[in-house]
């Protein structure tokens, strides 16, 4: 008897991840962080990637002894496993202060 396993096609959902980088980073370091996240998304099958720099803002409370942060938003379409991969990378990054992902 032959066993056939059926895989569900992964549905692409639109997500928006907002993250805050340290304000002490240089332009080159900021660009490298953005490119690393973008490459990670592309390598894992994300589509329609839009990255927005919303600028440097004062934080409501101290995060890792920082008063300010540089805010970015990434909007992308991908499978739900992609969110876990991106958030794991952000959690391990010393330059990312906070991140939050929403379904759009």
UniProtKB/Swiss-Prot annotation:
PROSITE patterns for the chain: RIBOSOMAL_S6 (PS01048)
Main location class: plastid
A Gene Ontology molecular function term of the record: small ribosomal subunit rRNA binding
Signal peptide interval: none
Keywords: Cyanelle, Plastid, Ribonucleoprotein, Ribosomal protein, RNA-binding, rRNA-binding
Matching SUPFAM superfamilies: Ribosomal protein S6
Gene Ontology CC annotation, any one: cyanelle
Its biological purpose: Binds together with bS18 to 16S ribosomal RNA.
UniProt-listed NCBIfam families: S6
Family: Belongs to the bacterial ribosomal protein bS6 family.
Stated name of the protein: Small ribosomal subunit protein bS6c
Organism: Cyanophora paradoxa
Gene assigned in the entry: rps6
